[in-house]
């Protein structure tokens, strides 16, 4: 027996937890395959890494250059490695115990790209390679700017071979070659290009050769003079416009007019030095997934600083920038880790693959109506969401842990170099956000196929957009950081950003032999920003999911609080409806039922389990169609212990009535009470005492019949011995106990067995109210009779509302019947009363040859002048004879008389059946509706 009162929150949570654990046990291999996905993907990375190592990392081009040298002069050579034996690319990997000092160089445009317009010079200089290099000035003090611009280029070229670097530091040297990743070898010096000396004017014979560097890194370079041209601009806007128009996409002609640098002196004066420098930052990261290159900015800073010092102290004051020099380094090897290079997009896909799994599971229960049937049997929203969330969180956590373990075991630097606890914390908060998003999205989908397509588009779209759009903008220095923050509000990009930071730290750590990201550097990376975004979005998604679910359950529009309804308009509309109702004709029995309901509404008694008072349901019109009145005005009272049957043609409104009573839709007007509880306000409490047998079986294919009943029994607060006893009795009563049928998966049941299980589910726990929609559909005669007995026994302490198309079923089970046509009760009473009221005639059937049809009709009319022929085809005729005008013996006499005059093949006399009553009432009601 059930405990007194409904099941508690934790009892219901325990019920669904046990059901889910059993369900997952049946699907254990699906879960194993899901958790093994990271392993398979990590193995793919291992093979890619091995291929990359053989072709790239271990290539001779990516190692320090070596030659076989005869050091002892004995004809035997020894393999010797060093910078002197290396190409420019190989030199990066060589040991450099004493790095070379190199003179600092300024980056200037190549001759064919130097700035050219009417303010500078004509285009003939490009043909002669003699265009000057341009430096722009602006600021608040034009005269000060003129002095500083002159000081930049006032020094004549001077050389002192005894101290070459000191001598070169007195000059302004430049190159057209961009910087490398390091300064171990300066590309401007080791290349074949010339070194340029920027002068105010280039005198004759100003080009010569010079030797730079120490053996073995000694290079002879051509020193060429290039004219420097300083130009003043009124403000920074003009400078920005000029720089932009010098870009080949910044002007309509596609011309390139590059400027060396630009200086904004702001409010610089004798006591304040404040300067802003424009330089071309695109050279820093023009090669994606490569280390940043050195940008030649320090010499630009030193250049203008010297000009300012000379403005203050005179031309002899100098602050020399003699050289740039790297720190010593050991020999290294190329150690490019594929997992770190492609980690952001790869692991974005790996982690996001959980989203379709979660979303499909939620939408499947929604599509198959499993969630609503659980709710109808007492499972509240709270236990459902908490247990579902906990399950998906556990599954996702195992998935992430296995991903980290597999990645570490096979040696992926992405996992080994970054702090494990930091990684897990990031993944953990994100999978919580992902589960919340899946819950939120599940409200937008009703079909698994649609949800699956949308989810996979999100997965792969997020990875591709992250790599080709978000990462491009992230690495571009010109893109505003605030817009990066806005983009990170998209969950796919916040995940990508976190993985990008992990990959960059692992890549740099592996390249330099250091660790990756650690907690102590948490605030130094954007990872802290991403953490905060994910946590906030996690809670926002949970709140939004709760709100949408509550609004959907209550039937309210999501934006109901924005809608302002006109009370006068509503009351006027109701007045019109009431006046329309008042002129409709109602039968006396229906009026008596309405009066009984009105009396019950005034009383506080709960003797009647179900009370419906003027219940209406109108569906709004769509596509220009008028509103559909599914249930017009329904007043009904069903006491406990009664089975009330609803008969009616398709579209009569029976299903809409059941949907209102089970909470699927809200009534348009009127009221309904179950055990004294209002279905519009207390539906969650109503569910705890309700059982439902839907028209279509809503079962889990992998759960057994016993497991179904155990789950629903727990929802009805059955425990221990009472639970097991109730389950066993239910299985026996519907003939699902013997032969091991109870422990077979429901997916292997026949249609009839599933139907019997659905009836058993609706009756377990002795619910106070049960709704059954065609419970015996698809059953063989023996099973049908057995099931009817079960239902009849169950109604002793239960109010049952049953819909059926079987008149035999209705007559056997129902204490009272109501015939429903066009949304309205046409009659109500027990089967005998209805047959007596609407069936006051006998039906005589007689089959003869066609030529005797008129003779038969004349003989029957002799018995009663009010006889009515209701059927006629190929010699077979049916006549309806009023009972009050004829005796049965008189009918027999007519038959005997007919037999004596002609051959009668067959005949029969029957009382009116319930089916005849149903047809008669339905036709009369439909005819009246058409007429009205």
UniProtKB/Swiss-Prot annotation:
Molecular function (Gene Ontology), one example: ATP binding
Domain ABC transporter: 610-847
Membrane-spanning parts: 34-54, 338-358, 392-412, 424-444, 453-473, 483-500, 526-546
Record-annotated disulphide pairs: none
Keywords associated with the record: ATP-binding, Membrane, Nucleotide-binding, Transmembrane, Transmembrane helix, Transport
Topological relation to the membrane, as annotated: Multi-pass membrane protein
UniProt-listed SMART domains: AAA
Subcellular location as annotated: Membrane
Gene Ontology annotations for the cellular component aspect, listed alphabetically: membrane
Amino acids binding ATP: 648-655
Entries under InterPro entries matching the protein: AAA+_ATPase, ABC2_TM, ABC_transporter-like_ATP-bd, ABC_transporter-like_CS, ABCA, P-loop_NTPase
Stored Pfam families: ABC2_membrane_3, ABC_tran, ABCA12_C
Family note: Belongs to the ABC transporter superfamily. ABCA family. CPR flippase (TC 3.A.1.211) subfamily.
Name of the protein in question: ABC transporter A family member 3
Organism: Arabidopsis thaliana (Mouse-ear cress)
Source species taxonomy: Eukaryota, Viridiplantae, Streptophyta, Embryophyta, Tracheophyta
This protein's encoding gene: ABCA3
């Amino acid at each position: 027996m059930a405990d007194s009162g409904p099941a508690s929150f934790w009892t219901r949570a325990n019920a669904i937890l046990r059901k889910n654990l059993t369900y997952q046990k049946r699907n254990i291999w699906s879960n194993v395959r899901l958790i093994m996905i990271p392993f398979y993907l990590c193995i793919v990375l291992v093979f890619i890494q091995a291929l990359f190592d053989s072709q790239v990392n271990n290539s001779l081009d990516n190692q320090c250059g070596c030659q076989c040298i005869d050091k002892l002069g004995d004809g035997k050579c020894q393999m010797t490695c060093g910078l002197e034996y290396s190409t420019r690319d190989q030199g990066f990997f060589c040991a450099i115990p004493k790095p070379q000092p190199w003179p600092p160089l300024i980056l200037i445009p190549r001759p064919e790209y130097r700035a050219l317009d009417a303010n500078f010079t004509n285009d003939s200089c490009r043909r002669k390679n003699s265009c000057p290099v341009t430096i722009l000035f602006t600021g608040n003090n034009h005269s000060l700017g003129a002095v500083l611009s002159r000081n930049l280029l006032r020094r004549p070229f001077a050389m002192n071979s005894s101290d070459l670097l000191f001598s070169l530091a007195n000059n302004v040297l430049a190159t057209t070659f961009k910087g490398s990743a390091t300064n171990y070898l300066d590309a401007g010096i080791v290349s074949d290009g010339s070194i340029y000396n920027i002068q105010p004017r280039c005198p004759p014979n100003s080009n010569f050769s010079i030797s730079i560097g120490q053996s073995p890194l000694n290079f002879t370079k051509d020193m060429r003079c290039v004219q420097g041209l300083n130009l003043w601009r009124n403000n920074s806007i003009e400078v920005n416009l000029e720089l932009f128009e010098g870009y080949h996409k910044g002007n309509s002609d596609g011309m390139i007019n590059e400027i060396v640098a630009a200086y904004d002196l702001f409010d610089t004066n004798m006591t304040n030095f404040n300067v802003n420098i424009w330089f071309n930052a695109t050279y820093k990261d023009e090669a994606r997934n490569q280390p940043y290159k050195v940008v030649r900015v320090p010499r630009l800073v030193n250049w203008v600083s010297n000009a300012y010092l000379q403005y203050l102290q005179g031309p002899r004051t100098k602050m020399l920038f003699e050289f740039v020099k790297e720190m010593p380094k050991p020999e290294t090897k190329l150690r490019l880790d594929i997992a770190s290079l492609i980690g952001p997009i790869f692991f974005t896909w790996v982690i996001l693959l959980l989203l379709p799994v979660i979303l499909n599971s939620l939408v499947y229960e929604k599509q198959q109506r499993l969630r609503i049937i659980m709710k109808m049997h007492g499972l509240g929203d709270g236990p459902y969401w908490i247990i579902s969330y906990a399950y998906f969180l556990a599954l996702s956590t195992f998935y992430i842990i296995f991903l980290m373990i597999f990645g570490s075991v096979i040696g992926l630097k992405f996992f080994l170099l970054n702090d494990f606890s930091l990684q897990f914390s990031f993944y953990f908060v994100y999978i919580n956000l992902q589960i919340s998003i899946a819950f939120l999205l599940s409200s937008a989908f009703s079909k698994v196929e649609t949800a699956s397509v949308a989810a996979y588009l999100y997965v792969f779209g997020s990875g591709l957009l992250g790599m080709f759009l978000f990462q491009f903008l992230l690495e571009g220095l010109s893109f505003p950081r605030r817009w990066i923050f806005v983009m990170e509000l998209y969950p796919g990009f916040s995940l990508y950003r976190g993985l990008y930071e992990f990959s960059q730290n692992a890549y740099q750590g592996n390249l330099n032999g250091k660790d990756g990201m650690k907690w102590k550097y948490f605030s130094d990376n954007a990872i802290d920003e991403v953490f905060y975004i994910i946590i906030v979005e996690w809670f926002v998604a949970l709140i939004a999911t709760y709100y949408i679910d509550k609004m959907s359950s209550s039937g309210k529009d999501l934006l109901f609080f924005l809608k302002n309804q006109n009370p006068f308009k509503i009351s006027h509309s109701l007045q019109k409806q009431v006046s329309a109702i008042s002129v409709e004709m109602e039968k006396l029995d229906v009026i008596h039922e309405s009066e009984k309901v009105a009396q019950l509404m005034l009383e506080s008694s709960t003797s009647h389990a179900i009370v419906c008072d003027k219940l209406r349901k109108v569906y709004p019109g769509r596509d220009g169609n008028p509103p559909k009145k599914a249930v017009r005005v329904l007043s009904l009272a069903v006491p406990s212990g009664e089975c009330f049957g609803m008969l009616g043609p398709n579209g009569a409104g029976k299903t809409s009535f059941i949907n209102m009573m089970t909470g699927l839709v809200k009534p348009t007007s009127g009221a309904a009470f179950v055990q004294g509880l209002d279905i519009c306000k207390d539906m969650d409490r109503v569910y705890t005492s309700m059982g439902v047998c839907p028209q279509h079986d809503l079962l889990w294919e992998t759960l057994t019949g016993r497991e179904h009943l155990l789950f629903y029994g727990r929802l009805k607060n059955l425990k221990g011995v009472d639970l097991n006893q109730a389950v066993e009795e239910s299985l026996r009563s519907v003939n699902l106990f013997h032969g091991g049928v109870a422990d077979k998966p429901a997916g292997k049941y026949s249609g009839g067995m599933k139907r019997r299980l659905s009836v058993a589910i609706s009756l377990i726990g002795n619910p106070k109210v049960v709704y059954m929609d065609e419970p015996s559909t698809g059953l063989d005669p023996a099973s049908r009779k057995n099931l009817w007995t079960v239902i009849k026994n169950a109604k002793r302490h239960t109010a049952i509302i049953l819909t059926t198309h079987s008149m035999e079923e209705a007559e056997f089970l129902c204490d009272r019947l109501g015939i429903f046509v066009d949304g309205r009760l046409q009659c109500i009473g027990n089967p005998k009363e209805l047959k007596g009221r609407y069936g006051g005639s006998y039906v005589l059937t007689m089959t003869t040859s066609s030529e005797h049809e008129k003779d038969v009709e004349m003989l029957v009319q002799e018995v009663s002048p009010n006889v009515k022929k209701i059927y006629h085809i190929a010699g077979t005729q049916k006549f309806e004879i009023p009972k009050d005008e004829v005796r049965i013996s008189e009918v027999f006499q007519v038959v005997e008389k007919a037999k004596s005059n002609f051959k009668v093949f067959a005949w029969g006399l029957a009382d009116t059946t319930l089916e005849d009553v149903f047809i008669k009432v339905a036709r009369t009601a439909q005819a009246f509706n058409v007429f009205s």
